[in-house]
C-alpha cells in the first residue's frame, strides 16, 4: 500500500552536517521525497508537536533538544512507507539498534538519535499536517 510518513532530521544530525547523508540513505532505500523544509522550532511548536509526551519525565529535555538547532522535516512516500522507514531508522535504544540503520550509523544517545518517524497512519497524517500544507506536498 502506497503511504506517506513524516521524517524529522533532528538537531544532533543537522549540527553534524548529516542531512545529505540521511536523505541519500532514504532515497537509496526506495523512499521518495514529496516535501522538505529546514526550520527552527520554537518552544511552543515543539511542545505542541510532542504533546502526547507532556506527562513523561523526558518531555522538558526533549523539547529543549528539539529547539537547540534547526531540524529538517520531510514527507516520505513509498510502499508501506511507515513500517519501511521505521525499519530504516532502527530502534531508539542504542543496545537494540541493528547495524546499518540510520540510528546505528548516526545516533549519539536515546534522545540524540538523529531522526524521528511517524509510528502509525494516524500519527503520520497528524505529523505531516503539522509541518506541511497540502500545496507543499508534490
Swiss-Prot record:
It comes from the Bacteria. Its EC number is 2.7.4.6. GO terms for cellular component: cytoplasm. Pfam families: NDK. It catalyses: a 2'-deoxyribonucleoside 5'-diphosphate + ATP = a 2'-deoxyribonucleoside 5'-triphosphate + ADP; a ribonucleoside 5'-diphosphate + ATP = a ribonucleoside 5'-triphosphate + ADP. Its cofactor is Mg(2+). CDD domains: NDPk_I (cd04413). Gene3D superfamilies: Nucleoside diphosphate kinase-like domain (3.30.70.141). Keywords: ATP-binding, Cytoplasm, Kinase, Magnesium, Metal-binding, Nucleotide metabolism, Nucleotide-binding, Phosphoprotein, Transferase. ATP binds at residues 10, 58, 86, 92, 103, 113. GO terms for biological process: CTP biosynthetic process; GTP biosynthetic process; UTP biosynthetic process. It is found in: Cytoplasm. One of its GO terms (molecular function) is ATP binding. InterPro entries: NDK-like_dom (IPR034907), NDK-like_dom_sf (IPR036850), Nucleoside_diP_kinase (IPR001564), Nucleoside_diP_kinase_AS (IPR023005). The active site is at 116 (pros-phosphohistidine intermediate). Homotetramer. Belongs to the NDK family. Major role in the synthesis of nucleoside triphosphates other than ATP. The ATP gamma phosphate is transferred to the NDP beta phosphate via a ping-pong mechanism, using a phosphorylated active-site intermediate. This is Nucleoside diphosphate kinase. The lineage of its organism: Bacteria, Pseudomonadati, Pseudomonadota, Gammaproteobacteria, Pasteurellales. The gene is ndk.
Amino acid at each position: 500500500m502506497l503511504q506517506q510518513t513524516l521524517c524529522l532530521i533532528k538537531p544532533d544530525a543537522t549540527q553534524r552536517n548529516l542531512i545529505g547523508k540521511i536523505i541519500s540513505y532514504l532515497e537509496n532505500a526506495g523512499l521518495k521525497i514529496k516535501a522538505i523544509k529546514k526550520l527552527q522550532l520554537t518552544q511552543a511548536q515543539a511542545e505542541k508537536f510532542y504533546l502526547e509526551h507532556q506527562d513523561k519525565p523526558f518531555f522538558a529535555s526533549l523539547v529543549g533538544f528539539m529547539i537547540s538547532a534547526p531540524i529538517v522535516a520531510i514527507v516520505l512516500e513509498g510502499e508501506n512507507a511507515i513500517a519501511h522507514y521505521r525499519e530504516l531508522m532502527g530502534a531508539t535504544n542504542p543496545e537494540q539498534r541493528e547495524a546499518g540503520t540510520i540510528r546505528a550509523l548516526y545516533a549519539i544517545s536515546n534522545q540524540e538519535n538523529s531522526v524521528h518517524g511517524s509510528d502509525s497512519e494516524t500519527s503520520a497524517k497528524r505529523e505531516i499536517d503539522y509541518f506541511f500544507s497540502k500545496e507543499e506536498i508534490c
